[in-house]
UniProtKB/Swiss-Prot annotation:
It is found in: Cytoplasm. The gene is rimM. This is Ribosome maturation factor RimM. It comes from the Bacteria. GO terms for biological process: ribosomal small subunit biogenesis; rRNA processing.
Length: 177
């Protein structure tokens, strides 16, 4: 493990509970295809506020889970120390998209209705069965007294325009909803 740090960190997954006694851990992947998490190396974790690079030794499927073995993690006690650590990579490793957006690109964007009402900023994204949903933290002086809005990311239908240079998303949405 080295102390390098990712320049633009992005979370791709999380280490779960131990598997067995030889230092294996379950992994929860946030990538669209769960096994794609292994396409992005090196991995970084944060321990005690410091970045550590971890090296993947091996991985395999076990029932519905994915389990991993990291170099230098030889027993259950060492693996236990990594439970719940987020798996982070440098976002520069992600492929450029011809069409569409990474969730990370939408975070912090100001959301405005087609009528010009400022709904707030994107603070999170949720995946539902049918479509993604923007989680928007409303401005402090929201006229409708709303603190948080959930707006479906339906391109063309609700989402009218995404401008990553100005960090704005224009939506056709009722601010009172």
């Amino acid at each position: 493990m080295s102390n390098k740090a990712p320049v633009e960190p992005i979370v791709l997954g999380k280490m779960g509970s131990c598997y067995g006694i030889r230092g294996w851990l379950r992994v929860f992947s946030s990538t669209e295809d769960a096994e794609s998490i292994f396409d992005y190396q090196p991995w970084f974790i944060q321990k005690g506020g410091k970045w550590e690079e971890v090296e993947l030794e091996s991985w395999r499927r076990h029932n519905q889970d994915i389990v991993i073995k990291l170099k230098g993690v030889e027993d259950r006690d060492a693996a236990n120390l990594l439970t719940n650590c987020e798996i982070v990579v440098d976002s520069s490793q992600l492929p450029k998209l011809d069409d569409g957006y990474y969730w990370k690109d939408l975070m912090g964007c100001q959301v405005v209705t087609t009528e010009g009402y400022e709904l707030g900023k994107v603070i999170d994204m949720m995946e539902t069965g049918s479509n993604d949903v923007l989680v928007i933290k409303a401005n402090l002086k929201d006229a409708f007294g709303i603190k948080e809005r959930l707006v479906p990311f339906l391109d063309g239908q609700v989402i009218k325009k995404v401008d990553l240079t100005t960090r704005t998303i224009e939506v056709d949405w009722d601010p009172g909803f």
